[in-house]
């Protein structure tokens, strides 16, 4: 083995070997165990959330594969309609083109080119992370098979009355010209205004105070043009007499009713609210309750129409409402119209006041434009009938959430579910399988030929396919079964569905998880007709945040590519990556500045195993992950520790009883074997409970502290003793090898590369013949090998040796200087342990002699260590240079007195305490406490040595 651990020298070659040998594919034996990779968007590269997700899934798959399950971990990518289309449109913009210049067909060719380039990048990253996915079964949400499955699902749901076309309110992105989902809307806290406007009462009506108008508060005066009512709370006594009467809409002159609705808060503004059902989601619900007309006043750009479009709630045209709008606002942008409308209201004496008001402004997460609630014709899935069985599946335990608290989030969403808008006004995506004749009649089918045959439409009937595409979440909602060959009843579908675990972030429980459950249970049935669930367990993890706890996003410029931590990256390359191809290029300068501050030298190379172990160690259930580069560095050191331990073992492993020779186990051998059994049981238990943090912690504790720090040291006296019995030396060598071999198997799901590299060399010494560690059996604890007596003896020894180390450090006694020991309160067990381990203590702790004192015996002035009730005394006389040590201590005491005075003065200065941030003050207080404690310790030592 190389002297130093170089991850890059081993990682790629091992991955290529595993893949070429087909080790990632199902091995054909055992009960199935399936995970479908949540398909990353084919829009560039994987981020830290994907890296975390992959580390968790691969740990599960490698663990279950070693347990003998027939594992399938299937990879793939998502076409990510809106995000991908935007990226390609931006590339065209740079060349002075747009998609309409190219036309739909040529534009889609460009997107496919981008997909091939980007998808290859994602596959490379997944490989580099060591993910043991079955590449022979890689899928893409728009490959031929999945496209057929999407059409099939749409047609079946339509035939079952669960998909319909309707005119409803959607989140409309006025820049991208498409409906977007709630997930793609970000609510920004902004300082805005509340306009208080006079709405004249019609027909001579008056308020209780005798006024002939109502004052209505609004944050969007431009939507006044589409008002359908003014609402008041039914219990608001000020307005009860006016319910059912009318106001005249300012600037427009249209009569609109005064209605009573609990939605109105009497404490907000004047208690009167304008209702614009076609441009506000809450108003739309009020409109439904009161059968109000829907008046659309904007076009797709959010420019004011010359006359409103009036509809009834069922989407039919309302011909009773006056749709005339003032000509001066026609074709004005909504925000330009706002200024004009407010000015006109003011001129007519209808503007009462403008108040400052904090509000949430919805913006498209990709375009950055203010989202407009807009009335359009869209396709919808009727979700309530699908939600009921999906709720029952979680209630009765067929699907379990880990941690369980996320079930409540799931239930609250599902019990208040709204119909799902599945159409998008894009070109990139699954085109909706619906056709229209020239009269506007719609026909749904798998293809045009089927539609013509089913509805007996001759060649003379001109059909036009719907231009819209399906929401990306629709195709990804079919992911667990469409990727296994559905609608064909393939062998893979029969064996590997339902899948076992879905690993996902909490932020898409509703958008993806719930929809997968609903669609799968409706479309996939068992032989007895009962619905299949898509997965048995949903493991929900938190978001991976940056070191400051901020969510990672391209717009914040804090996204890390996991491969940059694996392979390292220069500062210049990191800046280029973070600031190029941005949706909002104006943020580039700010992002460059913060990147230089955080990574002035770029990012060092840590290797895949260190990054994966970091992810697993941070995976406490359900909490957000604050990513810490310091942890990665620490686990890179852990890899070095394992590497160096393996080199020591290989150096000592020439005769370890692999051919059946006699051997004898020392106390230390029995102890480490016993500790190994406990570690095997603990790591297994925690992995089965999805506690990757506790599993990795148990493994780290065993390998670093027990095996490397203690057992390797305890093995040396046996192996270095030329007079030791051959059987005992062989027993220690055998234990060194076999415990390391098992520890490597335990660590393999977390750190696949380093464990494979070392295992290949260790396995033959342990008498194991196998091609790869990944197909070796998972270690199973043997309770018969737990040796409580050996554990007790070694813990006693460790306490004694640590006590002596501390005395050497405190008293500045060199590590090679032999120590005479006096022992007080030594019981029979203590004396037995001393006698049995005398040789070991003399070699490892450099103990010169032991003297057991009786109750009446007086010990010389000594430094003391406690091991239970046993007092271990190290006499100071003769061990230290008294004058030199006193001089050294005086120097330290003076330095600490100065530090205590300096920090104490700072903290007693009111000017400093009043101005400094709390964190700085806390740091200074901690520094003072530390210095005071150190001063007390050194003063005590000085007194003890002076008394010698």
UniProtKB/Swiss-Prot annotation:
GO terms for molecular function: aminoacyl-tRNA deacylase activity; ATP binding; valine-tRNA ligase activity. This is Valine--tRNA ligase. Residues 877-947 form a coiled coil. It catalyses: tRNA(Val) + L-valine + ATP = L-valyl-tRNA(Val) + AMP + diphosphate. HAMAP family: Val_tRNA_synth_type1 (MF_02004). Catalyzes the attachment of valine to tRNA(Val). As ValRS can inadvertently accommodate and process structurally similar amino acids such as threonine, to avoid such errors, it has a 'posttransfer' editing activity that hydrolyzes mischarged Thr-tRNA(Val) in a tRNA-dependent manner. GO terms for biological process: valyl-tRNA aminoacylation. Transmembrane segments: none annotated. It comes from Pseudomonas putida (strain ATCC 47054 / DSM 6125 / CFBP 8728 / NCIMB 11950 / KT2440). ATP binds at residue 554. Belongs to the class-I aminoacyl-tRNA synthetase family. ValS type 1 subfamily. Its EC number is 6.1.1.9. A motif ('KMSKS' region) lies at residues 551-555.
């Amino acid at each position: 083995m190389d002297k130093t651990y170089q991850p890059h020298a081993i990682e790629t070659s091992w991955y290529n070997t595993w893949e070429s040998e087909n080790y990632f594919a199902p091995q054909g034996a055992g009960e199935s165990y399936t995970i479908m990779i949540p398909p990353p968007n084919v829009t560039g590269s994987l981020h830290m959330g994907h890296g975390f997700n992959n580390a968790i899934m691969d740990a599960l798959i490698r663990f279950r594969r070693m347990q003998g399950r027939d594992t399938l971990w299937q990879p793939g990518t998502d076409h990510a309609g809106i995000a991908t289309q935007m990226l390609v449109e931006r590339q065209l913009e740079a060349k002075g083109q747009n998609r309409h210049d190219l036309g739909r067909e040529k534009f889609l060719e460009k997107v496919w080119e981008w997909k091939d380039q980007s998808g290859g990048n994602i596959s490379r990253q997944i490989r580099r992370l060591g993910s043991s996915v079955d590449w022979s079964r890689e899928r893409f949400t728009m490959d031929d098979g999945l496209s057929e499955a999407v059409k099939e699902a749409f047609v079946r749901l339509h035939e079952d009355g669960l998909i319909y076309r309707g005119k409803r309110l959607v989140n409309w992105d006025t820049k991208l010209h498409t409906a977007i989902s709630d997930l793609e809307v970000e609510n920004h806290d902004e300082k805005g205004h509340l306009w208080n406007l006079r709405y004249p009462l019609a027909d001579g009506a008056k308020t209780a105070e005798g006024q002939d108008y109502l004052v209505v508060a609004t944050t969007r005066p431009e939507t006044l043009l589409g008002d359908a009512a003014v609402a008041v709370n039914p219990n608001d006594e000020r307005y009860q007499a006016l319910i059912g009467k009318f106001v005249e809409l300012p600037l427009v002159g249209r009569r609109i009713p005064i209605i009573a609705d609990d939605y109105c808060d009497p404490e907000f503004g004047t208690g009167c609210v304008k209702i614009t059902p076609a441009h506000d989601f809450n108003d739309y619900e009020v409109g439904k309750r009161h059968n109000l007309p829907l008046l659309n006043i904007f076009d797709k750009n959010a420019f004011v129409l010359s006359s409103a479009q009036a509809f009834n709630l069922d989407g039919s045209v309302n011909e009773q409402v006056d749709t005339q709008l003032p000509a001066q606002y026609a074709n004005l942008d909504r925000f330009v119209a706002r200024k004009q409308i407010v000015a006109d209201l003011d001129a007519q004496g209808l503007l009462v006041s403008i108040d400052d008001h904090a509000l949430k402004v919805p913006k498209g997460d990709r375009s950055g434009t203010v989202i407009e609630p807009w009335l359009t014709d869209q396709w919808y899935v009727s979700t309530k009938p699908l939600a009921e069985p999906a709720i029952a599946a979680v209630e009765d335990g067929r699907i379990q959430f880990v941690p369980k608290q996320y079930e409540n989030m799931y239930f609250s969403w599902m019990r208040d579910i709204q119909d799902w808008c599945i159409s998008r006004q894009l070109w990139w995506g699954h085109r909706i399988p619906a056709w229209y004749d020239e009269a506007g009649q719609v026909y749904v089918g798998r293809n045009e030929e089927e539609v013509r045959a089913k509805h007996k439409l001759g060649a003379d009937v001109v059909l036009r396919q719907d231009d819209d595409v399906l929401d990306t979440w629709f195709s990804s909602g079919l992911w667990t079964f469409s990727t296994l060959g559905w609608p064909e009843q393939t062998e893979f579908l029969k064996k590997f569905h339902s899948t076992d675990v879905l690993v996902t972030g909490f932020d898409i429980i509703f958008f993806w998880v719930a929809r997968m459950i609903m669609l799968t249970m409706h479309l996939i049935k068992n032989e007895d007709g009962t619905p299949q669930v898509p997965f048995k367990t949903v493991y929900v993890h938190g978001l991976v945040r940056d070191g400051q706890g901020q969510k990672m996003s391209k717009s914040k410029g804090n996204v890390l590519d996991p491969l940059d931590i694996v392979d390292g990256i220069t500062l210049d390359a990191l800046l280029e990556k973070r600031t190029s191809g941005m949706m909002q290029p104006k943020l580039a300068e700010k992002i460059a500045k913060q990147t230089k501050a955080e990574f002035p030298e770029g990012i060092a190379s840590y290797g895949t195993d260190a990054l994966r172990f970091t992810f697993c160690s941070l995976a406490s259930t359900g909490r957000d992950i604050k990513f810490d580069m310091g942890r990665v560095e620490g686990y890179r050191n852990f890899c070095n520790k394992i590497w160096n331990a393996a080199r020591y073992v290989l150096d000592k492993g020439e005769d370890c009883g692999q051919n059946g020779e006699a051997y004898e186990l020392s106390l230390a051998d029995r102890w480490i074997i016993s500790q190994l059994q406990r570690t095997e049981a603990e790591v297994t238990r925690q992995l089965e409970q999805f506690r990757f943090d506790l599993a990795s912690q148990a493994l780290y504790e065993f390998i670093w502290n027990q095996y490397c720090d203690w057992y390797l040291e305890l093995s040396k006296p046996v192996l270095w003793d030329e007079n030791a019995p051959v059987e005992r030396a062989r027993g220690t060598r055998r234990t060194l090898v076999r415990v390391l071999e098992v520890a490597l198997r335990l660590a393999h799901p977390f750190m696949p590369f380093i464990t494979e590299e070392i295992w290949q060399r260790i396995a033959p010494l342990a008498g194991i013949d196998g091609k790869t560690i990944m197909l070796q059996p998972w270690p199973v604890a043997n309770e018969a090998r737990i040796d409580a007596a050996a554990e007790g003896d070694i813990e006693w020894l460790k306490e004694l040796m640590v006590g002596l180390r501390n005395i050497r450090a405190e008293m500045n006694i060199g590590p090679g200087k032999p120590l005479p020991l006096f022992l007080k309160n030594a019981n029979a067990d203590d004396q037995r342990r001393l006698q049995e381990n005398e040789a070991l203590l003399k070699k490892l702790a450099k103990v010169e002699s032991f003297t057991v004192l009786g109750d009446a015996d007086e010990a010389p002035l000594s430094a003391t260590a406690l091991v239970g009730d046993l007092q271990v005394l190290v006499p100071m006389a003769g061990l230290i240079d008294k004058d030199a040590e006193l001089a050294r201590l005086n120097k330290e005491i003076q330095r600490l007195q100065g530090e205590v005075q300096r920090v104490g003065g700072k903290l007693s200065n009111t000017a400093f305490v009043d101005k400094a941030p709390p964190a700085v003050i806390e740091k200074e207080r901690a520094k003072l406490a530390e210095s005071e404690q150190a001063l007390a310790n050194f003063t005590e030592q000085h007194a003890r040595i002076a008394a010698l």
